[in-house]
C-alpha cells in the first residue's frame, strides 16, 4: 500500500500544479454521477479499476506529493485490460489526462526499500517501547522503595518517641495498718489442702464480746449466732467453734473447782 500511495501518479501527471481537479460530473442524477465517475476513472488510470477513487481533493502539492506517485504500476497499467463496464470514454466535462510516461525508466520501485524501512522503524519503535517500559518499571520500583522508606521512617520515629517518653510509674500501694488487716481468715494454703487448719486469732474486742455472750448464755441459737457473726465480722462456724471450746474450758474449770471443794469439805469433817 505504501508503494501505491507514493508512486501512483508520478508518470501520468508530470505537471501536478497545472492539473485541474475533477468534479464528479453532473449531480442531477445518481446514475449519471456513477457513470461519469466510472468512465473518468477507467479512462484516467488505464487499467482495471475496481471503483475506489483515491485522488479526490488532491492538489499539485498533495498530502503524499504528486511527483512521487505510482512508479511501479506502469507495467500493470499497460498490460491489464479494462473491464467492459469501465471501458467507456471520459465525459466532456473532464479534460483527458496526458499519456502516462514509463515510470520504469524514471526510477525503480522502492517497495523493497519501504518494506525494509518499515521493518527498521518497527524495530526502533519496539526498542524504544522496551526502553520506556524498563524505565517505567525502574521508576515504579524507585517510587515503591521510596514509599517504603517513608513508611519505615515514621514507624521508627514513633518507636523512638515511645522509648524516649518516660514510662508511667506504677501506682503506689496504699499503706495498710495492722488494724486494717483481716485476722480471722482461715489459712487453708499453709498446710496444704489436706493439712491442719490454722488457728483463728481473735482480737481483744471480739474476745470480750464473746465472753459477755457466754456469761449470759452458754448455748446459742442459730438466729443469735448469725447476729453475733455479723456484729463481730466473723463466720457462724467460727462463733460455733469458739463457744464449743469455751464450754469445754468451763466444764474443766468447774470440775476442778468441784473436786477441790469436795476435797476441802472432806478434810474438815469431824
Swiss-Prot record:
<dbReference type="GO" id="GO:0016477">
    <property type="term" value="P:cell migration"/>
</dbReference>
<dbReference type="GO" id="GO:0035264">
    <property type="term" value="P:multicellular organism growth"/>
</dbReference>
<dbReference type="GO" id="GO:0005634">
    <property type="term" value="C:nucleus"/>
</dbReference>
<dbReference type="GO" id="GO:0060644">
    <property type="term" value="P:mammary gland epithelial cell differentiation"/>
</dbReference>
<dbReference type="GO" id="GO:0060435">
    <property type="term" value="P:bronchiole development"/>
</dbReference>
<feature type="short sequence motif" description="Antp-type hexapeptide">
    <location>
        <begin position="176"/>
        <end position="181"/>
    </location>
</feature>
<dbReference type="GO" id="GO:0060441">
    <property type="term" value="P:epithelial tube branching involved in lung morphogenesis"/>
</dbReference>
<dbReference type="GO" id="GO:0060439">
    <property type="term" value="P:trachea morphogenesis"/>
</dbReference>
<feature type="compositionally biased region" description="Low complexity">
    <location>
        <begin position="75"/>
        <end position="86"/>
    </location>
</feature>
<dbReference type="InterPro" id="IPR050296">
    <property type="entry name" value="Antp_homeobox"/>
</dbReference>
<dbReference type="InterPro" id="IPR020479">
    <property type="entry name" value="HD_metazoa"/>
</dbReference>
<dbReference type="GO" id="GO:0060484">
    <property type="term" value="P:lung-associated mesenchyme development"/>
</dbReference>
<dbReference type="InterPro" id="IPR001356">
    <property type="entry name" value="HD"/>
</dbReference>
<keyword id="KW-0805">Transcription regulation</keyword>
<keyword id="KW-0371">Homeobox</keyword>
<dbReference type="GO" id="GO:0060764">
    <property type="term" value="P:cell-cell signaling involved in mammary gland development"/>
</dbReference>
<dbReference type="GO" id="GO:0045639">
    <property type="term" value="P:positive regulation of myeloid cell differentiation"/>
</dbReference>
<dbReference type="GO" id="GO:0002009">
    <property type="term" value="P:morphogenesis of an epithelium"/>
</dbReference>
<dbReference type="InterPro" id="IPR001827">
    <property type="entry name" value="Homeobox_Antennapedia_CS"/>
</dbReference>
<comment type="function">
    <text>Sequence-specific transcription factor which is part of a developmental regulatory system that provides cells with specific positional identities on the anterior-posterior axis. Also binds to its own promoter. Binds specifically to the motif 5'-CYYNATTA[TG]Y-3'.</text>
</comment>
<feature type="region of interest" description="Disordered">
    <location>
        <begin position="75"/>
        <end position="175"/>
    </location>
</feature>
<dbReference type="Pfam" id="PF00046">
    <property type="entry name" value="Homeodomain"/>
</dbReference>
<dbReference type="GO" id="GO:0000978">
    <property type="term" value="F:RNA polymerase II cis-regulatory region sequence-specific DNA binding"/>
</dbReference>
<dbReference type="GO" id="GO:0001501">
    <property type="term" value="P:skeletal system development"/>
</dbReference>
<dbReference type="GO" id="GO:0048706">
    <property type="term" value="P:embryonic skeletal system development"/>
</dbReference>
<feature type="compositionally biased region" description="Low complexity">
    <location>
        <begin position="119"/>
        <end position="134"/>
    </location>
</feature>
<dbReference type="GO" id="GO:0045944">
    <property type="term" value="P:positive regulation of transcription by RNA polymerase II"/>
</dbReference>
<dbReference type="GO" id="GO:0016525">
    <property type="term" value="P:negative regulation of angiogenesis"/>
</dbReference>
<dbReference type="GO" id="GO:0030878">
    <property type="term" value="P:thyroid gland development"/>
</dbReference>
<keyword id="KW-0238">DNA-binding</keyword>
<dbReference type="GO" id="GO:0060480">
    <property type="term" value="P:lung goblet cell differentiation"/>
</dbReference>
<dbReference type="GO" id="GO:0030324">
    <property type="term" value="P:lung development"/>
</dbReference>
<dbReference type="GO" id="GO:0060536">
    <property type="term" value="P:cartilage morphogenesis"/>
</dbReference>
<dbReference type="InterPro" id="IPR009057">
    <property type="entry name" value="Homeodomain-like_sf"/>
</dbReference>
<dbReference type="GO" id="GO:0048286">
    <property type="term" value="P:lung alveolus development"/>
</dbReference>
<dbReference type="GO" id="GO:0045647">
    <property type="term" value="P:negative regulation of erythrocyte differentiation"/>
</dbReference>
<dbReference type="GO" id="GO:0060749">
    <property type="term" value="P:mammary gland alveolus development"/>
</dbReference>
<keyword id="KW-0804">Transcription</keyword>
<dbReference type="GO" id="GO:0033599">
    <property type="term" value="P:regulation of mammary gland epithelial cell proliferation"/>
</dbReference>
<dbReference type="GO" id="GO:0010628">
    <property type="term" value="P:positive regulation of gene expression"/>
</dbReference>
<dbReference type="GO" id="GO:0001228">
    <property type="term" value="F:DNA-binding transcription activator activity, RNA polymerase II-specific"/>
</dbReference>
<comment type="subunit">
    <text>Forms a DNA-binding heterodimer with transcription factor PBX1.</text>
</comment>
